[in-house]
């Protein structure tokens, strides 16, 4: 990069060398940061210059998957008020490329990150829709009348394609048949409900994850339907009436991001933004100090401190999701927290025009172990006439947990259709 101005005069370097932050915990935010034109808060940037001719900038947790990116030897163009600069950069861990443009004056840094292209964006960045259910002949385990012997048989009417993807390598045994039954049942149930909640998912080239979703009440969900899916395969005709009149709205940016690492797609939730959104959307007065402390604890990866503060916060909010989180045991909370804050590692494969984004056995095992603890959250999401089914739901989740932990190979996630 070459500076467009060879005159290097400007403020004294010591006056602009500082850490600039717009974190909520900073009482005097001095960083104006935009990410592809959208304001980005809760971040910090180091800026330093010794001579006023070149600078070093360190970006902290701004690019998805990059804890810190240090850019050196940045040419500065100075004037009486400050220094301007621009250039191109690349992530150390994710191979993300980007452009940066900024200006620093005494007490203020303005920085725009643009032209962001995540590593593997050419392969994965796209808008994905849910597929229609396709039924046909599939080889499945079938038991004899007494359940003493199981054989592989080709059976018509089975689910070949659906929005929930499930595959497990099982043996022709009672255990294998149990895993198959639970797996097919969950695939049916999730694929039945998911189209009512989700229309499409977008993995942006800039790392943002957004979706078109519906918050209308669920239709056609009752106990007979749910348990019927353990025996009866799902069909598209069961789904279509429930989604015909649903309205879908776009989700905001900033709640989830993606990046690639070691060939896997890592999905990461922005807990700080999510917690701030829950608090700001509540009509109840929130102590800003608690919100700030939670966000700081999240950034410091202090799971138990986060749980303690969320417990205090939810005494005012009475939010069902937060209530579930703070009531799980410490071991489960630690697992959930670490999983969400470090990112969810997912495999991506493509076949016959469909894209499969899923967890393998290693990625899914922590979730399978947590399933029994999810019962209160699942029950809270069910229609009012199903709220008394806590015991049955608990039994259901325990069965799934045991069945999904037994196979050597298991794949569980989404089957999607890319727009292009």
Residues covered by each model-derived region:
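N-terminal glycine/threonine-rich, aromatic-flanked beta-hairpin/loop signature
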Residues: 37-72, 142-293
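Short beta-strand edge/turn micro-motifs at domain boundaries
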Residues: 127-131, 146, 269-270, 357-359
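Short, solvent-exposed coil/turn segments at beta-strand boundaries
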Residues: 50-55, 79-82, 101-110, 201-210, ...
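Broad, structure-driven detector of short, well-ordered beta-strand segments within folded domains
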Residues: 44-48, 99-104, 194-207, 344-348, ...
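Bacterial Sec-dependent N-terminal signal peptides
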Residues: 1-26, 107-128, 132, 403-420
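Extended, solvent-exposed, non-transmembrane regions
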Residues: 13-77, 86-123, 139, 146
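Hydrophilic extracytoplasmic domains
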Residues: 235-236, 244-256, 262-264, 271, ...
């Amino acid at each position: 990069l070459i500076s467009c101005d060879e005159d290097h005069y400007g403020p004294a370097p010591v006056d602009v060398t500082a850490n600039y932050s717009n974190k909520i915990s900073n009482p005097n935010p001095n960083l104006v940061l935009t990410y592809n034109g959208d304001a980005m808060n809760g971040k910090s940037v180091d800026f330093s210059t010794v001579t006023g001719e070149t600078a070093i900038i360190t970006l902290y947790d701004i690019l998805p998957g990059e804890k810190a990116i240090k850019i050196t030897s940045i040419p500065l163009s100075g004037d009486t008020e400050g220094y301007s600069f621009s250039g191109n950069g690349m992530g150390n861990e994710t191979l993300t490329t980007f452009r940066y443009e900024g200006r620093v004056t005494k007490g203020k840094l303005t920085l725009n990150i643009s032209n962001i292209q995540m590593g593997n964006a050419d392969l994965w960045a796209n808008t994905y829709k849910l597929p229609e259910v396709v039924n046909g002949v599939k080889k499945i385990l079938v038991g004899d009348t007494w359940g003493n012997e199981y054989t592989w048989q080709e059976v018509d009417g089975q689910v070949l394609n659906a929005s929930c993807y499930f595959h497990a390598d099982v043996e022709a045994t009672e255990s294998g048949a149990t895993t198959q039954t639970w797996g097919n049942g969950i695939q049916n149930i999730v694929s039945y409900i998911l189209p009512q909640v989700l229309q499409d998912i977008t993995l942006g080239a800039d790392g943002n994850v957004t979706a078109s979703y519906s918050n209308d009440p669920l239709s056609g969900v009752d106990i007979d339907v749910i348990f019927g899916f353990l025996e009866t395969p799902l069909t598209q005709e069961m789904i279509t009436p429930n989604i015909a009149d649903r309205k879908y709205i776009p989700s905001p940016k900033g709640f989830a991001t993606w990046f690639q690492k070691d060939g896997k797609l890592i999905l990461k939730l922005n807990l700080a933004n999510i917690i701030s959104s829950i608090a700001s959307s509540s009509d109840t007065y929130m102590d800003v100090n608690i919100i700030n402390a939670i966000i700081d604890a999240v950034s410091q990866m202090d799971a138990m401190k986060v749980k303690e503060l969320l417990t205090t916060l939810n005494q005012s909010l009475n939010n069902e999701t937060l209530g579930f989180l703070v009531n799980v045991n410490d071991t489960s909370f630690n697992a959930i927290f670490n999983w969400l804050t470090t990112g969810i590692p997912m495999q991506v494969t493509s076949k016959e025009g469909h894209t499969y984004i899923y967890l393998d056995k290693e990625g899914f095992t922590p979730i399978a172990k947590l399933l029994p603890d999810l019962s209160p959250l699942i029950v809270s999401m069910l229609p009012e006439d199903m709220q008394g089914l806590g015991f049955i739901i608990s039994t259901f989740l325990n069965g799934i947990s045991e069945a999904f932990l037994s196979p050597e190979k298991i794949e569980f996630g989404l089957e999607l259709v890319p727009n292009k």
